[in-house]
C-alpha cells in the first residue's frame, strides 16, 4: 500500500546544540508540553512511591522521563527537578550513600569504560527496589529504602517479614552495611522471551501496601554492594553466600574485557533466571572507602542495559495509504527509534476507524514493539500532545474497481496497482519497486496501468532518476512481460481470484473468460457465491474491458483474435 503523501500532517523537528532531536515548537507550546509531561510523571511517581501502585509500565515511565529531560535540554531548561527518583518522604539516613550506576549506551562505550580498569566482575542488573540492610551485633537492625541515595524510608518492619532475607549474621557480616535489590522471585524467567513484567513496580507495591504480609514471601534479595567489606572479591562473595545471600556468588563472574561482558550479558538474557533483569552491571573489585561514596559518583561500576522490548516513539506525521483494492490504511511516521537492531520510523495503525479510536495526532508519544517477522506494532498511546492537529483522511470512494486509469484523486491507488502488477504474484517485473514506478509515471504520465508497454527504450533511458543500467534492466523486463501467460496478465488486472482458482478454470483467452457463467466461478477452489459475484462485476467493468482491448492491440497473448 502506498502512502497518501499529499494528505500527510506532521510536526517539524530540529537539532539542539546538544545534538538532541527537538520538536520545533514555539516557546509557549514547548513550555506547556514540558510542564504537562513533568506533572504527569510527578503524579505517577507519587502514586508509585506512596501507594505502591504502578499507573504505567516501568519501561514507559523511564523512557518518558528521558524524553522530558531531552525536551528540557532542547530549550535550555534546568533538568535537576525532573521527577525520575522517589520523593523524599523518608528521613532515615543511610550509613553509606547509594551511588547509583552510570549507564553505558553500547558495546563501544563498554570497551571504553573497561579500558584501564582491572579486577572486573559482571553481575545481572536485577530489576527491583534498592535497599540498605544494616546488621549490628549479628542482627538486622535497620532496612532503608534508597530514597535520594542519602536518606530514605524506614522499611525495617516489612523487611523483617521477608523470609529470604537473613535476620541474623555472623563473623565479618555481624556488623555490616549491605546494599542490594529486593526483587520479585521468579522461576525460570527468560528475559528475552518474557520481558520485564513490571517486576519493579510489583515488588515496590508489596513493600508499601499494609494488608499483604503473605505476599512478601515472594520477594528475594540480591546483594550488590558490601561497603568496606573484604577487598578480595571471591572472599567477599563466599562470605555473603555463607550468610544466606547466595545469589550474589552464583551470579557474579570475573571478566577481562568487553567481549566477556557481552557473553555474560547475552547468556543471562536468554537463560532461565530466578529474577527479572534489565541488563548487567560491571564493577571493579576494588572500591573506595564507604565514607567517599556519594550519589551519582560511583565511577567504579557501570551498567549496560538491555534494549527495551518496546520503545516510546514520537509521532511526527500521520499519513494515509490506499492499497490496490481501495482500502485506506493509516500510517504513523515516527521520530526513528531502534528496536532489536531495527530502525523503526513508521508503524501501521490500521483503518481510519481504528485511528480515530486511538486518537493519535502528531506530537503524541506511542509505545511500539516488534510483532512477528520484525513488523512494527502499535501497543498503546502513552502520552498525548495538547495540540490535536489531525489530517483529514481521503474520501471513501475507492474500491477494488477504481483507479485502473490515472487521475489526480487516484494517484496512490494507481501506484499501488503498478506495484502489484510488477510483483511476483502477477508479471514478476524484477527490480520494479515503488520508486521506479513513481519516476516513470511522473515523467511519462501513464494513462492506465499498462501504458508502460508503449514506452521506448529511449524514453525509459531519459527518465529523471533512472540510471542507465537501471533503464536497460527496466526495458528488458518490459520486453519479457509480453511473453507472460494469459493467466499472469489477468492476475495483473487484479481479477478477484487466487492464481490457483484461475488456473483451475483453464481459461486461455479473454474471449473464453467472457463466456464463463457465475455458476462456473462458484465451483472453483476457494471461490464461493460472494467471490463469484465479484468476478462478474470485475469482468463487466468498463475500465477492465477497455484494458483488454488495449492489450489486444499490443498483441498480448490471449487478448487478440
Curated annotation (Swiss-Prot):
Give the protein name, as stated in the record.
DNA ligase B
Q: Which UniProt keywords apply?
A: DNA damage, DNA repair, DNA replication, Ligase, NAD
Function statement: Catalyzes the formation of phosphodiester linkages between 5'-phosphoryl and 3'-hydroxyl groups in double-stranded DNA using NAD as a coenzyme and as the energy source for the reaction.
- NCBIfam families linked: PRK08097.1 (NF005987)
Record-stated family: Belongs to the NAD-dependent DNA ligase family. LigB subfamily.
Q: What's the short name of a Pfam family annotated to this entry? A: DNA_ligase_aden
What's the domain of life for this entry? Bacteria
UniProt catalytic activity: NAD(+) + (deoxyribonucleotide)n-3'-hydroxyl + 5'-phospho-(deoxyribonucleotide)m = (deoxyribonucleotide)n+m + AMP + beta-nicotinamide D-nucleotide
- Per the UniProt entry, the Enzyme Commission number(s) are 6.5.1.2
Q: Please name the GO terms of the biological process aspect recorded for this protein, alphabetically.
A: DNA repair; DNA replication
Q: Which GO terms describe its molecular function?
A: DNA ligase (NAD+) activity
Q: Which residues form the active site?
A: 125
> Which Gene3D superfamilies does the UniProt record give?
DNA ligase/mRNA capping enzyme, Helix hairpin bin, Nucleic acid-binding proteins
Q: Which organism is it from?
A: Salmonella paratyphi A (strain AKU_12601)
Amino acid at each position: 500500500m502506498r502512502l497518501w503523501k499529499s494528505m500527510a500532517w506532521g510536526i517539524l523537528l530540529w537539532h539542539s546544540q546538544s545534538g538532541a532531536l527537538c520538536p520545533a515548537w514555539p516557546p509557549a507550546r514547548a513550555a506547556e508540553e514540558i510542564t504537562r509531561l513533568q506533572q504527569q510523571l510527578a503524579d505517577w511517581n507519587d502514586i508509585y512511591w506512596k501507594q505502591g501502585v504502578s499507573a504505567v509500565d516501568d519501561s514507559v515511565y523511564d523512557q518518558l522521563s528521558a524524553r522530558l529531560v531531552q525536551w528540557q535540554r532542547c530549550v535550555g531548561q534546568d533538568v535537576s527537578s525532573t521527577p525520575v527518583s522517589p520523593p523524599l518522604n523518608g528521613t532515615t539516613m543511610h550509613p553509606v550513600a547509594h551511588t547509583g550506576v552510570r549507564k553505558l549506551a553500547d558495546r563501544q562505550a563498554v570497551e571504553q569504560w573497561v579500558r584501564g580498569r582491572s579486577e572486573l566482575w559482571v553481575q545481572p542488573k536485577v530489576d527491583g527496589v534498592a535497599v540498605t540492610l544494616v546488621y549490628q551485633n549479628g542482627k538486622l537492625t535497620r532496612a532503608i529504602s534508597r530514597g535520594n541515595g542519602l536518606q530514605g524510608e524506614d522499611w525495617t518492619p516489612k523487611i523483617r517479614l521477608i523470609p529470604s532475607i537473613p535476620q541474623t549474621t555472623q563473623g565479618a557480616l555481624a556488623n555490616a552495611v549491605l546494599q542490594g535489590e529486593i526483587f520479585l522471585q521468579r522461576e525460570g524467567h527468560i528475559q528475552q522471551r518474557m520481558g520485564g513484567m513490571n517486576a519493579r513496580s510489583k515488588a515496590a507495591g508489596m513493600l508499601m501496601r499494609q494488608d499483604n504480609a503473605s505476599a512478601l514471601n515472594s520477594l528475594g534479595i540480591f546483594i550488590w554492594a558490601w561497603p568496606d567489606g573484604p577487598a578480595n572479591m571471591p572472599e567477599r562473595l563466599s562470605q555473603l553466600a555463607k550468610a544466606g545471600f547466595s545469589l550474589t556468588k552464583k551470579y557474579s563472574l570475573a571478566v577481562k574485557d568487553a567481549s566477556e561482558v557481552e557473553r555474560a550479558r547475552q547468556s543471562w538474557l536468554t537463560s532461565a533466571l530466578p529474577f527479572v533483569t534489565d541488563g548487567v552491571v560491571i564493577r571493579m573489585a576494588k572500591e573506595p572507602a564507604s565514607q567517599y561514596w556519594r550519589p551519582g559518583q560511583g565511577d567504579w561500576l557501570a551498567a549496560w542495559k538491555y534494549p527495551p522490548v518496546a520503545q516510546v516513539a514520537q509521532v511526527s506525521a500521520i499519513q494515509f495509504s490506499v492499497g490496490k483494492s481501495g482500502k485506506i490504511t493509516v500510517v504513523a511516521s515516527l521520530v526513528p527509534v531502534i528496536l532489536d537492531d531495527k530502525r523503526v520510523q513508521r508503524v501501521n495503525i490500521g483503518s481510519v476507524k481504528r485511528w480515530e479510536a486511538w486518537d493519535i495526532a502528531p506530537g503524541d508519544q506511542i509505545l511500539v514493539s516488534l510483532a512477528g517477522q520484525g513488523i512494527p506494532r502499535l501497543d498503546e498511546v502513552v502520552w498525548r500532545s495538547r495540540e490535536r492537529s489531525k489530517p483529514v483522511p481521503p474520501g471513501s470512494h475507492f474500491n477494488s474497481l477504481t483507479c485502473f486509469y490515472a487521475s489526480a484523486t487516484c494517484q496512490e491507488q494507481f501506484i499501488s496497482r503498478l506495484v502489484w502488477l510488477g510483483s511476483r504474484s502477477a508479471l514478476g517485473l524484477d527490480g520494479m519497486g515503488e520508486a521506479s514506478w513513481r519516476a516513470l509515471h511522473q515523467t511519462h504520465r501513464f494513462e492506465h496501468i499498462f501504458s508502460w508497454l508503449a514506452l521506448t527504450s529511449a524514453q525509459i533511458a531519459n527518465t529523471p532518476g533512472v540510471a542507465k543500467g537501471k533503464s536497460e534492466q527496466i526495458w528488458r523486463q518490459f520486453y519479457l512481460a509480453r511473453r507472460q501467460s494469459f493467466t499472469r496478465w489477468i492476475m495483473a488486472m487484479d481479477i478477484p481470484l487466487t492464481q490457483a482458482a484461475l488456473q483451475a478454470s483453464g481459461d486461455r483467452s479473454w474471449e473464453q473468460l467472457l463466456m464463463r457463467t457465475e455458476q462456473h466461478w462458484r465451483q472453483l477452489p476457494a471461490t464461493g457465491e460472494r467471490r463469484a459475484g465479484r468476478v462478474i462485476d470485475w469482468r463487466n467493468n468498463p475500465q477492465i474491458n477497455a484494458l483488454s482491448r488495449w492489450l489486444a492491440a499490443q498483441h498480448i497473448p490471449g487478448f487478440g483474435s
